[in-house]
């Protein structure tokens, strides 16, 4: 089965709340995780919420990494989407999990852009 990309949706639990509320450290971990996976970083944007929590995106040539943190819960929601077969998105997810001092990570991988069977869609008058 050929796909255009792999998209991992990771639920990372039991993380260090101080790490999850440190914007600069989260940005560094996200960029480093992209680089460790072999991706080429293009742009980054991160925002710290009041009183806590961070959302951010790392745009890579191969697609993107995103994060949303809940430091008070020790929880991070992470997406890693990579196009092509040169980058392994699991490398980035595993690196982040380690750096967040997480106790548990569950994840789902979705194959994106599978074109094995073309389905014809017809417009209908509703």
From Swiss-Prot:
Its EC number is 4.1.1.50. The lineage of its organism: Bacteria, Bacillati, Bacillota, Clostridia, Eubacteriales. Is synthesized initially as an inactive proenzyme. Formation of the active enzyme involves a self-maturation process in which the active site pyruvoyl group is generated from an internal serine residue via an autocatalytic post-translational modification. Two non-identical subunits are generated from the proenzyme in this reaction, and the pyruvate is formed at the N-terminus of the alpha chain, which is derived from the carboxyl end of the proenzyme. The record marks 62-63 as: Cleavage (non-hydrolytic). Its cofactor is pyruvate. Binds 1 pyruvoyl group covalently per subunit. The modification Pyruvic acid (Ser) is found at residue 63. InterPro entries: AdoMetDC_C (IPR042286), AdoMetDC_fam_prok (IPR003826), AdoMetDC_N (IPR042284), S-AdoMet_deCO2ase_core (IPR016067), S-AdoMet_deCOase_pro-enz (IPR017716). Pathway: Amine and polyamine biosynthesis; S-adenosylmethioninamine biosynthesis; S-adenosylmethioninamine from S-adenosyl-L-methionine: step 1/1. Pfam families: AdoMet_dc. PANTHER family: S-ADENOSYLMETHIONINE DECARBOXYLASE PROENZYME. Catalyzes the decarboxylation of S-adenosylmethionine to S-adenosylmethioninamine (dcAdoMet), the propylamine donor required for the synthesis of the polyamines spermine and spermidine from the diamine putrescine. SUPFAM superfamilies: S-adenosylmethionine decarboxylase. Signal peptide: none annotated. Heterotetramer of two alpha and two beta chains arranged as a dimer of alpha/beta heterodimers. This is S-adenosylmethionine decarboxylase proenzyme.
């Amino acid at each position: 089965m050929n796909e255009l990309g792999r998209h991992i949706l990771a639920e990372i639990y039991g993380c260090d709340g101080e790490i999850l509320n440190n914007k600069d450290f989260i940005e560094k971990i996200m960029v480093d995780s992209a680089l460790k996976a072999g991706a080429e970083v293009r742009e980054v944007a991160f925002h710290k919420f009041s009183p806590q929590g961070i959302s951010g995106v790392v745009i890579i040539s191969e697609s993107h990494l995103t994060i949303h943190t809940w430091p008070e819960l020790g929880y991070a929601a992470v997406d890693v989407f990579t196009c092509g077969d040169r980058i392994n998105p699991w490398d980035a997810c595993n690196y982040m999990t380690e750096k967040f001092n997480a106790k548990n990570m569950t994840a789902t991988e979705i194959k994106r852009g599978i074109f094995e069977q073309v389905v014809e869609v017809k417009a209908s008058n509703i």
